[in-house]
């Protein structure tokens, strides 16, 4: 095993990695949600007028669904949760405003992390999230969030530490690089993000706990020794480490149970109007009589435009206000709706 000492790593990639780790360690406290504010939310009983842990956790799951729907990366989701929690820990928020705040957190994070071509429009996010607010509402709330967080939105999160720890391990191990799955670790981090309690953990500690538990399952002495050196360099004391590792272990045990709705596997639910539901229902059982497409034939652009218009008409209800009592709504599993709308 290679030594993690800076002397041995002089002139190598390891020096830069440890330097970056020092920067992250200096920054992490500044971007953590106020513990006092999080504790107030934790102590709040569930009712209709006050923000409680259950509402916060449900909103984070909504953010995960939005990130999955728009194909956003894990960094966008984790940063959105960080922005959301930092704001909730500062302000006394009413439950009716939580949807708007959640959407704004997602949009702010996406603009920081994603490429321009992958940033969803405000209109699309409003429609898909069904947050019942306008583009003007989103703009005003984004301004409020940015001001309250002093425009420091690009935070150092547990995901930054997770990626850096993972890179440091691979830089110093002789074992196969694919043995430690970063995708699996990211999925586990997202599971922790869905619980308010882990927003109180230091990002460096949370990331190290996830890696430690995964390395233990691999039963790799070499990887464990590297982690111990990283822990020592990060100045993480045993009491803090073992406390959070126990909580993470319990969370992941529940996450892997059959009863748990896993963040990456939870099915999206789509609410559609009666007219759209009727169209989907009919198309499922009917066999469309389409003309045979000749080989080498030209694609008719006018037909494509007509079909797009038909689809947009059917989806008008997604961006409108909630249906009245006389209007029936149907719940469709997203995978089913996707199959019906986009046949292979």
From Swiss-Prot:
Induction: Activated by actinomycin-D induced DNA damage. Keywords: Cell cycle, Cell division, Cyclin, Cytoplasm, Mitosis. Residues 301-320 are annotated as: Disordered. It comes from the Eukaryota. High levels in cerebellum, thymus, spleen and prostate. Low levels in skeletal muscle. GO terms for biological process: cell division; G1/S transition of mitotic cell cycle; regulation of cell cycle. GO terms for cellular component: cyclin-dependent protein kinase holoenzyme complex; cytoplasm; nucleus. Residues 301-313 have a biased composition (Acidic residues). InterPro entries: Cyclin, Cyclin-like_dom, Cyclin-like_sf, Cyclin_N. Pfam families: Cyclin_N. It is found in: Cytoplasm. May play a role in growth regulation and in negative regulation of cell cycle progression. Belongs to the cyclin family. Cyclin G subfamily. PANTHER family: CYCLINS. This is Cyclin-G2. The lineage of its organism: Eukaryota, Metazoa, Chordata, Craniata, Vertebrata. The gene is CCNG2.
């Amino acid at each position: 095993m290679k030594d993690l000492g800076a002397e041995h790593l002089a002139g190598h990639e390891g020096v830069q990695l440890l330097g970056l780790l020092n920067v992250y360690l200096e920054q992490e406290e500044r971007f953590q949600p106020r513990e006092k504010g999080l504790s107030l939310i934790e102590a709040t009983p569930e009712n209709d007028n006050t923000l409680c842990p259950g509402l916060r956790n449900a909103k984070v799951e909504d953010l995960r669904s939005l990130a999955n729907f728009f194909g956003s990366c894990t960094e966008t989701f984790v940063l959105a949760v960080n922005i959301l929690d930092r704001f909730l820990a500062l302000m006394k928020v009413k439950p009716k405003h939580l949807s708007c705040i959640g959407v704004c957190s997602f949009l702010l994070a996406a603009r920081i992390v994603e490429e321009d071509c992958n940033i969803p429009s405000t209109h699309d996010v409003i429609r898909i999230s069904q947050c019942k607010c306008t583009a003007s509402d989103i703009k005003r709330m984004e301004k409020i969030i940015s001001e309250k967080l002093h425009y420091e939105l690009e935070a150092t999160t547990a995901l930054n530490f997770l990626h850096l720890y993972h890179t440091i391990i691979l830089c110093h191990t002789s074992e196969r690089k694919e043995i430690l799955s970063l995708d699996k670790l990211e999925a586990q981090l997202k599971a922790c993000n869905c619980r308010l309690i882990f927003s109180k953990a230091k990002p460096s500690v949370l990331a190290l706990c996830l890696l430690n538990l995964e390395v233990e399952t691999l039963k790799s002495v070499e990887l464990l020794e590297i982690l111990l050196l990283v822990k020592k360099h990060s100045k993480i004391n045993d009491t803090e480490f073992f406390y959070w590792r126990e909580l993470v272990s319990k969370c992941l045990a529940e996450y892997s149970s059959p009863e748990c709705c896993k963040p990456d596997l939870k099915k999206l639910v789509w609410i559609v109007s009666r007219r759209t539901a009727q169209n989907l229902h009919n198309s499922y059982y009917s066999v469309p009589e389409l003309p045979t497409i000749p080989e080498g034939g030209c694609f008719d652009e006018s037909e494509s435009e007509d079909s797009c218009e038909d689809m947009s008409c059917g989806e008008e209800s997604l961006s409108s206000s909630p249906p009245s009592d006389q209007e029936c709504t149907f719940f469709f599993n997203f995978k089913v709706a996707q199959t019906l709308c986009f046949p292979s």
